[in-house]
Amino acid sequence: MHPPSICTRVACLAAASLIPAISLAQRTEPAGATRAQGSEQSAPVSGIEYEVTFDSASAARRSLHVAMSFDVASDAPVVLSIPAWTPGAYEISYFARDVIGFDAHGDGDRSLEWDKLDYDSWRVRPAGSKRVMVSFDYLADTLDNAMSWSRPDFLLFNGTNVFPYPEGQGFDFPATVRIHTESGWRVATGMTPGSAPRTYNASNYHDLVDMPFFVGRFDLDSTRAGKGWLRIAAYPEGSIPPDARAADFQQLPSIIDEQGKVFGEIPFGDYTLMQIADSGYGAISGLEHQNSHVDVTTPLAIGQPILTSIYAHEIFHAWNVKRMRPADLWPYEYSNEQPTTWLWVSEGITDYYADLSRVRAGVIDSVAFFEAIAEKMAEVSNAPAVALEDASLSTWVHPEDGTSTIYYPKGALAGLMLDVLIRDASDNRASLDDVMRRLYQESYKKGRGFTGEQWWGAVSAAAGGKSFSDFYARYVDGRDSYPWKTILPLAGLKLTADTIRIPVLGVTTVADSGGLLVRAVAPGSTAGDAGMKPGDYLLSVNGMLVTERRFVSRLREMLGTRAGARITFDVQRGDQIMELSGPLQVTERIAMHLVADPAASPKAVRIRSGLLHGTR
């Protein structure tokens, strides 16, 4: 994430209608340092095994223990590195910072000499040993889809955090993972089980680090979906009520089937939805993997439609990103940033298909689908104008101008426009589905990422040879407003817009183990004038606790649009509880309403039906 990666997709529940009033984000780091260029290449290694230990004792220390063993054929130094980021969470996270007590041993448990080459690389000298083991503890105290997090009875960890790789030796090596934990605890992962209990195999490093683990006490249930099993692993136990779980098991297999129709196949057998619900977490976030995804959510979202939309988004990533992705991201490079101009396709069009697959599966109706599209239109209209390609590139530095994740809604809307234009040009005989299916075959199936030439070539071919150079120049590389007055009637849709006034508090927060941490305060805002500072913990607004159910909607109702009204905040600053107050700031926002046009032409009605039902 990483988000508020929305993927990392993050939906900021506590900020849904108050942005930028309250914006909930996960911990982020500046993408400043990069690995020193010219790091020493490792000597070859083989027979790689990782052992992860998490039990009651390590849980008490909020850590896990990691051991990596491998064979060497010479005394040449072995250089081991830990990734700096997790694919899908487009930010540098410096996972090596949580390594504690690194050590190395050789044959006969003999201590070996080692040193550090840079911030995330260690050099080990075998000194005659044929098999080497390195080990360390790893701090697991960050509630983040791309990180490691523990409780007295539970652990989430990502392979990118804890599995070193031999520098410069490529990523095609196989590896085995063994989990050591309490006898009564469970393990959940998408990794292929080995022959021994709690042993798992990966054919290469990319697969190895794309399979997060749950270890401990959590619910684990399954149902048939596609050609395998859909498993839901949920922490804490009992966090998903029976009615919500039943709805998930009814809806998600249908969503998977609809998404599979787009690409012509379901590329995974079993799929594991891994979810953490935490009352101190004020958002919803998801991070995709090739046959699983990890959600972190406020308990208030469980059973709500917004959470199902996150599920649909992350599952669609199993095709779009985890398999079909831009050449800029093929293969993944784990030590530095990997910027691309294509996140509007990888994330934005994924978001479009999250909505499409839900309406096509009958999970939502057409009215709800149109509402979801209209919300994206409003979000884009209320944000600064930015080119899709520029927004995609900038995500690594988390712009503070309100565009850090704009490629999600704006990219989704670009997908809608392309879909409508293709259907209109082909008399509804082709669609964006054809583009996705063709790119999937031409890129992923041939072991490579797609290029801009391939993307626009596929779009043009689906539209019968129509040129999209002007579309690209104005709406992808450029910052022109989307031409809804000409696009929407082609699909039998009608748009209206209203200007509304909403309260703006001007504080950006992040949920952590201590509560709702203030990350940034906008100068001249309600919170800024009240004297709130980054590092404060926000406890309540006008006496209403931030942990209360329906906090955002109730806060909006309470504050109304009374510009200048006195607003009080209770915050914790260090050991002190302080009451702050400031005048309410109010801003204008555009609200959009999208409906089916009863006067649409027969062709437009066919196109609208094609969008909603996946038919031609």
Regions found by a protein language model. Give the residues of each.
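Bacterial N-terminal signal peptides
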Residues: V10-A21
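Juxtacatalytic substrate-recognition/specificity segment
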Residues: M68, D219-L343
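Zn2+-dependent metallopeptidase catalytic core
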Residues: E91, F95-G101, N161, G168, ...
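Extended, low-hydrophobicity, Ser/Thr/Pro/Gly-biased non-transmembrane segments
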Residues: A127, S135-R217
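C-terminal recognition in membrane/secretory proteostasis and scaffolding
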Residues: A354-D355, I364-R616
